[in-house]
Amino acid sequence: MPEWNDQGIVLSAKKYGEKGLIINVLSENHGRHLGWFNNYKSKNILADVQPGNLVNVFWKSRLIEQMGKFKIELISSVSGKIFDEKLKLQALNSVCSLLEKFLPERQNYSQIFNATNAFIDLLTFQDESKNDYWMEGYVKWEIGVLSSIGFSLDLNRCAVTGSDTNLLFVSPKTGKAVSKEGAGRHAPRLLLLPSFLGGDNVIGSNFYKEILAGLNITSYFFKNKLLLSINTNKPTNLPNPRIRFVELIEKL
């Protein structure tokens, strides 16, 4: 019987029937994987399988192509560390929903696993300043996910002139940076490049506008590259937790 043991980040746990859960995890070495957990009520498992929690996962199945069953042991709980921080909780839900949406099942994405684990550590890090610079890490995490799946952005040099200065925009066609000189009359059609991604401070000093500009870049490529490649004939939209995350930032 096929089986494996691995670390995993819980993406979701959905009730199925009276006693069962279908748990979705991003494992370190076995990719995004579903598994059945039986009789969850008697085992007090719900607190352990909250989105973002790091768990030890044992998977076993009669046949490799079947969903199989999970045994779960909690390694680290996340939500309890940020339960009173609405924006961070929404960021965590956004991360899990994007991975669940875009990662194919059972393909090894150890790079994304490690990046996600590192971002969750950043998200839950407690310091006295209570600043929001973890949001920059969130945008860079999304860029890393795009790159790992096959849609890399090149933000270090102008695609038109080859210059590494005055980088103000990103081309929605190529995902490459464009300088002020290279943009010319096409500037209104380009995406703004915030300073924390190498832009020449085109957006000014408003931190949250910078974050929204970064999220606008990743939103564009998630919707117009990844979603279109998944559903070519259906309306495309990002997962609701990701949409709500942006809406919360817009209110700041």
State where each predicted segment sits.
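Non-catalytic alpha-helical scaffolds and adjoining flexible linkers that form interface surfaces
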Residues: 1-21, 26-252
